[in-house]
Structures are given as C-alpha cells and as structure tokens.
C-alpha cells in the first residue's frame, strides 16, 4: 500500500515541474 501511495504521489507531483518550462516559454512568446 505505501508503494502505491508513493507511486501515485510521484505521478501527481511529476507533471508540475515538467510543465513549468513549457508554460514559461509560452509566456515569453506571448509577451
């Protein structure tokens, strides 16, 4: 059970840092 919780927590936390550079590039393009 702890393995499943940590794995799901990793999946939830992973997209945030991964998408941060892309959103930054999009903001620079808009400006």
Swiss-Prot record:
UniProt KW keywords: Chloroplast, Electron transport, Membrane, Photosynthesis, Plastid, Thylakoid, Transmembrane, Transmembrane helix, Transport
GO terms, molecular function: electron transporter, transferring electrons within cytochrome b6/f complex of photosystem II activity
Subcellular location: Plastid, Chloroplast thylakoid membrane
Keyword Transport: yes
Superkingdom to which the source organism belongs: Eukaryota
Transmembrane segments: 7-25
Membrane topology per record: Single-pass membrane protein
Predominant localisation class: plastid
GO biological process, one term: photosynthesis
Keyword set includes Chaperone: no
Gene Ontology annotations for the cellular component aspect, listed alphabetically: chloroplast thylakoid membrane; cytochrome b6f complex
Family: Belongs to the PetL family.
Role summary: Component of the cytochrome b6-f complex, which mediates electron transfer between photosystem II (PSII) and photosystem I (PSI), cyclic electron flow around PSI, and state transitions. PetL is important for photoautotrophic growth as well as for electron transfer efficiency and stability of the cytochrome b6-f complex.
Description of how the protein assembles with itself and partners: The 4 large subunits of the cytochrome b6-f complex are cytochrome b6, subunit IV (17 kDa polypeptide, PetD), cytochrome f and the Rieske protein, while the 4 small subunits are PetG, PetL, PetM and PetN. The complex functions as a dimer.
Protein name from the UniProt record: Cytochrome b6-f complex subunit 6
Natural source organism: Huperzia lucidula (Shining clubmoss)
């Amino acid at each position: 059970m702890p393995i499943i919780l940590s794995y799901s927590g990793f999946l939830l936390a992973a997209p945030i840092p991964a998408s941060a550079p892309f959103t930054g590039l999009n903001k620079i393009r808009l400006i």
